[in-house]
Amino acid sequence: FPLLNLRMLHYPPERRVNTEDGRIGCGAHTDYGSITLLSDDGVGGLQVKPREGDWVDISIPEDHLVVNLADLLSIWTNNRYVSNPHRVMNPANTHRYSIPLFVTPPYHLKIETLPTCLAPGETPKHKPMISGEYLQSRFDGTHTYRNELMDDAL
């Protein structure tokens, strides 16, 4: 069974990091698993980076979801479907709320390019990996403060 992680996120208006476009609520990243379903409160702030060009504001119509493709789906499809970089630029003086549902393969599952996503003679662009090991490495890389806290605890 896939792992499902439902989060309820609050981006307060008083963020310290400013840019010309607004306030960073969540820096640029790709999601780790296979897909993410996202609902928000209509305030705005979600941006996606196309392969070429600048960040694009995404408006989610009421009663609709955004579907983000994530890293492990890219591996399965040999980059036919690529995880999309995105970020949140929280509008100034506004609270922002969103509810993402992260869908991830089971922790022990071997992730490798599907044969149907390879053209004749094509080789996979990614090495096979275990889902949970990949997720843990991405989590550790994103949340480096955890390692610092553990070092201080010892």
Task: Annotate each language-model stretch with its function.
Residues 1-154:
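C-terminal flanking tails of non-heme Fe-dependent oxygenases
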